[in-house]
A protein has these predicted regions:
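Covalent nucleotidyltransferase
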Residues: 1-278
Length: 278
């Protein structure tokens, strides 16, 4: 089980322990900046996380299971109605954060009693907005829409299959206890690290790059997209319109490549790249 050791971080005042249940209780809103890749966890990574949490939950101990650090930075997020809210820009940890949201959605939709629905309906579940795809549908992702939706749909299917293969009621109850109920002694927690608010966008990108060295490499198209967007954000940090338009146009182009008729017409059957846009 890949449980992080919290003690190694206690000397740093920017680190703290934050239970997943606390993220739900306080209705956190997370923003995934456009220079990051989207959701890319495959089935094995989703299953590994489920198995780790299940192994911890079965022990029924008064203990905590620590996920890897969630690196965040306070920011403002503008809603569709124009109102601004306090949010957290995620610099590292978005894959686990998003996968946990999908697990919580499964529990909410399939395992909650009527009493639990009434208790948690007002503040279930923490929000995540991908700035390059603000309309991303977590409930019913269409794998044909874009690559993020494809991976979301794959992850949701893996979660359903995993719970179906288990003794569902018992396992679902154990998951709810360690993920949702803050009063329970066994809690799944993030190691929460806050980057100081005064850091500028260019420094956020530098932090992101340092954190992601050695991880799964980006595809060619993801690198090109990130360079374009970072260039727009750095040159015109106070005006995000141009960067947002570039992201929107890029997503339209990526979606067009998912059209099989169009793809086979232009590709001549060449499927040797990691993604079609490459």
């Amino acid at each position: 089980m890949n449980n992080m050791n919290y003690n190694q971080f206690t000397d740093n005042p920017n680190f703290c322990r934050k239970a997943v249940a606390e993220l739900i209780k306080t209705k956190h809103h997370f923003v995934i900046p456009s220079y990051q890749r989207g959701y890319r966890w495959e089935e094995k990574q989703v299953i590994d996380l489920l198995n780790d949490i299940n192994e911890f939950a079965k022990q029924n101990k008064e203990d905590s299971y620590y996920l890897q650090p969630l690196v965040v930075k306070p920011c403002k997020w503008t809603r569709r109605d124009g109102s601004q809210i306090d949010a957290w820009e995620v610099l590292d940890g978005q894959q686990r954060l998003t996968t946990l949201r999908l697990i919580l959605m499964y529990l909410f939709e399939n395992s909650f009693t009527r009493t639990e629905m009434n208790t948690f309906s007002d503040n279930m579940i923490y929000d995540i907005t991908y700035t390059n795809r603000p309309q991303l549908d977590f409930s019913e992702p269409n794998p044909q829409d874009n690559i993020d939706s494809y991976y979301l749909a794959t992850a949701k299917s893996a979660i359903v299959d995993w719970f179906t293969e288990k003794a569902q009621d018992e396992v679902e109850t154990a998951f709810k206890h360690c993920l949702i109920y803050p009063s329970k002694p066994a809690q799944v927690k993030f190691i929460w690290y806050v980057v100081p608010d005064e850091k500028q966008t260019i420094e956020s990108i530098q932090v992101f790059n340092r954190l992601n060295k050695g991880k799964i490499s980006l595809t060619s198209s993801e690198l090109i997209k990130a360079l374009f967007i970072m260039d727009r954000n750095i040159i015109s940090n106070n005006d995000r319109v141009e960067a947002d338009k570039l992201t929107f146009d890029w997503n339209l182009m990526e979606r067009q490549f998912q059209n099989d008729k169009f793809w086979y017409f232009i590709s001549n059957g060449n499927d040797n790249q990691q993604t079609r846009i490459d």
